[in-house]
């Protein structure tokens, strides 16, 4: 699947230097520089991170100027490269999740990003700690009241154009706009001002995966120098700002950041993705029967896509007289006519799309047309926290929970959260006792065991016993270890 953002950009001949050769520091020099960077981060009182496309390449999203970058291939007449995953299923990288941990510990004060992939927000970085200079392919904004809408699908347009949706505020209702800049669009003042202020305050601006060529954004990190701050750059190519930097590291960003986190004795949290679905059931009485309609839709609107769902299976375990069905086309809808006096249970099985960490998840839905269900709204942040804790503890996706329900005569609607992916980056308890060379491959990439997507199906019982035995010998608790 090609990247919609790159295809939607208007054509521009001059995109700066592309296809620049990649530079790799020797293992010895890289190790030394990582140690130096770890000291700089540890001693920083106001760390600001400035990110570019290079921090997302390990998630399957191509960069722009590298040997296989978007603009490099376009200049050679090869067109836009394909992504290894659908854009909406791209997973935050080790670097994204490390930044989340650095922010939680209070070390990282702010992130300035030139990326539009939404991976910083998807990783869990607080919105107030992020400036997205070039916009976000998954975000809409109301030009009237400035309310932002983060979607689970890619917005159809770029260039600050109108989208098909409107502001949900009852006092507003204005047509929403996309937030992604085209070539001639000016940087959003709110994001720009916040980024400038943070760079001026920073005692260290760490530039990750950016060639620092796009103006005016590329000049922001240097604002820290005026107040005695420092700049560090981690990138595979040389940048125009290298001479101004206190430290320049040529290496894979994930590898460098993994080393920094290791030396600072900080964990890299797993990425746990939660998606949302709305289920509604409406009915009308027809003599002694009830005609009912089931709908499975997006929380972003009846016409909005559900990109994480491939199909929905509807079955009736306690009613062999009711035929099961597989809904394959969105919007997912089922109409039936049944007896009013016979309650039943619907089993809804959500079959997930490619890129999810498990194949499916099922929800039981009791139906009794003679009783009206109660309405409630649960604490969303608490429910999501519990869901994520359960997913991390079990090392698998597929958990679900109801967030809210509205019951009215002849209808009920509920919103459910589903854990659709879990990815671990830092799970080896014995790593601290192992030299760095053994957990970093000689080719410059992280060992596979530090980037492991966990599916829904648990490991075999034989493998679980072997792992548990090994952990007991090491004095570890098998229940908390990844299989």
Swiss-Prot record:
Cofactor binding mode and count: Binds 1 zinc ion per subunit.
GO molecular function term, any single one: metal ion binding
InterPro entries: DHS-like_NAD/FAD-binding_dom, NAD-dep_sirtuin_deacylases, Sirtuin, Ssirtuin_cat_dom
Disruption phenotype: Enhances histone H3K9 acetylation on transposable elements and promoters of hypersensitive response (HR)-related genes. This leads to increased HR-related gene expression, hydrogen peroxide production, DNA fragmentation, and programmed cell death.
Binding site for NAD(+): 53-57, 63-65, 114-117, 209-211, 235-237
Enzyme class: transferase
Zinc in keyword set: yes
SUPFAM superfamilies, alphabetized: DHS-like NAD/FAD-binding domain
Gene Ontology annotations of biological process type: negative regulation of transcription by RNA polymerase II
Catalytic activity: N(6)-acetyl-L-lysyl-[protein] + NAD(+) + H2O = 2''-O-acetyl-ADP-D-ribose + nicotinamide + L-lysyl-[protein]
Domain Deacetylase sirtuin-type: 27-270
Keywords assigned by UniProt, alphabetized: Metal-binding, NAD, Nucleus, Transferase, Zinc
Origin: domain of life: Eukaryota
One term under GO cellular component: nucleus
EC number assigned by the record: 2.3.1.286
Cofactors named for this entry: Zn(2+)
UniProt main location, coarse: nucleus
Localization: Nucleus
Pfam family, one: SIR2
Keyword NAD: yes
Binding site for Zn(2+): 142, 145, 167, 172
Function: NAD-dependent protein deacetylase. Has deacetylase activity towards H3K9Ac. May have a function in the safeguard against genome instability and DNA damage to ensure plant cell growth. May negatively regulate metabolic signal transduction involving methanol and jasmonates during leaf senescence. Required for histone H3K9Ac deacetylation and repression of AP2-1/RSR1 and amylase genes during early seed development. Functions as an epigenetic regulator to repress the expression of glycolytic genes and glycolysis in seedlings.
Family indicated by similarity: Belongs to the sirtuin family. Class IV subfamily.
Protein name from the UniProt record: NAD-dependent protein deacetylase SRT1
Organism the protein comes from: Oryza sativa subsp. indica
